[in-house]
């Protein structure tokens, strides 16, 4: 995305190791890209409406495989909804089938496309 002209990209990961590795890897060529440690279930450090676009690539799948999966998935999507700007876009890349995932989205997002 950065190489396509998108800037001010914030990447959030729950792994300190991943964040440190990626910060080192991108520091010279992607000056406006940030990697931050965080948990998508509680993104209190981010303001409501802070992001125009949120992309999830497999995080929902991981959350649904863990303990307290259903409540945590709802917390995650609630937080994404909160930090997403009005008319913002949420893109979720998931291996789950449409019907099993749809129930999580209808509570938080007006338009859902599968």
State the predicted function of each range.
Residues 98-114:
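Class I S-adenosyl-L-methionine
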Residues 69-86:
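A short glycine-rich, Lys/Arg-flanked "PGG" loop and its adjoining helix->strand segment in the class I
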Residues 41-55:
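A short acidic, Gly/Pro-enriched loop at the edge of an enzyme's catalytic core
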Residues 60-61, 95-100:
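Short "lid" loop at the C-terminus of a central beta-strand within the Rossmann-like core
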Residues 11, 52, 92:
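Conserved SAM-binding loop
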Residues 1-43, 78:
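Class I SAM-dependent methyltransferase SAM/SAH-binding core
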Residues 52-71:
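A short SAM/SAH-binding and catalytic strip from SAM-dependent methyltransferases
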Residues 86-94:
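Conserved beta-strand signature within the Rossmann-like core of class I S-adenosyl-L-methionine
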């Amino acid at each position: 995305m950065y190489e396509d002209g998108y800037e001010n990209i914030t990447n959030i990961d729950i792994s300190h190791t991943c964040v440190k590795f990626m910060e080192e890897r991108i520091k010279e060529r992607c000056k406006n890209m940030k990697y931050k440690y965080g948990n998508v279930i509680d993104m209190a450090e981010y303001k409501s409406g802070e992001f125009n676009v949120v992309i999830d690539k497999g995080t929902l799948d991981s959350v649904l495989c863990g303990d307290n999966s259903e409540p945590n998935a709802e917390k995650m999507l609630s937080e994404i909804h909160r930090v997403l700007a009005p008319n913002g876009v949420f893109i979720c890349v998931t291996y789950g089938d449409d019907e099993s995932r749809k129930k999580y989205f209808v509570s938080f997002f007006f338009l859902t496309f599968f």
